[in-house]
């Protein structure tokens, strides 16, 4: 679905800034689009008091803001606020919202490590490599590390290496790829290590 807003549509005087994406939103349609296409971000506390205030005062949607306040104070699953917004704004069809609800449910069925990896991968795709590393390392720092397979652990270290390479911190990238190879002898990992030595001759195999 392509987001297309009429130039004659109501526009708030103070757009809402979503720091994680580095964008401003200025309509309920844009908010729904962001939520629908970034479910992990929506699950990570996107809907807070500041956003609810924006919905009430800038979008002039007091009824929706009131429903969100009630849900927030009731102690219900915070993710219900996501669905309230999608349902009340009528930007997506009931079928689309149903598919989105299934996507959220699939995330909730994941283990803590798997969900954290999905979140890290999300930030990696956004090229927010520093944030991605924080989430990848959170998995490794967790005591559950002993229950992770060597294959999964190798993937985490590989992605840490790719993240560091993305910010040109080649020494850190080399160390991470080395760790990945220690857990799983993968030829692709060796290729990445070799490529790093070409980018930085001071690094050695």
Per-region residue spans from a language model:
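Amphipathic alpha-helical segments of tetratricopeptide repeats
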Residues: 138-144, 179-183
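Structural motif corresponding to the intra-repeat A-B loop/turn of tetratricopeptide repeats
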Residues: 126, 167, 200-201
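Flexible helix-coil transition and linker loops at the boundaries of alpha-helical arrays
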Residues: 103-107, 141-151
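Long, contiguous interaction/recruitment modules in multidomain scaffold/adaptor proteins
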Residues: 2-111
């Amino acid at each position: 679905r392509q987001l297309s807003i009429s130039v004659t549509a109501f526009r708030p005087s103070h757009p809402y800034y979503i720091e994680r994406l580095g964008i401003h939103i200025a309509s309920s349609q844009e908010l729904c689009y962001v939520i629908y296409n970034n479910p992990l971000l929506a699950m990570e506390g996107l809907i807070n008091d500041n956003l609810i205030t924006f919905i009430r005062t800038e979008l002039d949607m007091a009824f929706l803001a009131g429903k969100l306040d009630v849900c927030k104070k009731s102690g219900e699953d915070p993710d219900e606020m996501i669905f309230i917004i999608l349902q009340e704004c009528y930007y997506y069809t009931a079928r689309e919202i149903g598919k989105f609800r299934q996507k959220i449910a699939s995330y909730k069925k994941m283990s803590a490590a798997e969900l954290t990896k999905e979140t890290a991968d999300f930030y990696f795709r956004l090229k927010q490599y520093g944030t991605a590393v924080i989430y990848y390392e959170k998995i490794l720092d967790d005591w559950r590390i002993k229950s992770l397979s060597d294959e999964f652990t190798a993937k985490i270290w590989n992605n840490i290496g790719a993240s560091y390479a993305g910010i040109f911190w080649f020494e850190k990238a080399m160390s991470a790829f080395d760790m990945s190879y220690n857990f799983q002898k993968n030829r692709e990992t060796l290729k990445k290590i070799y490529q790093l030595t070409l980018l930085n001759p001071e690094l050695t195999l």
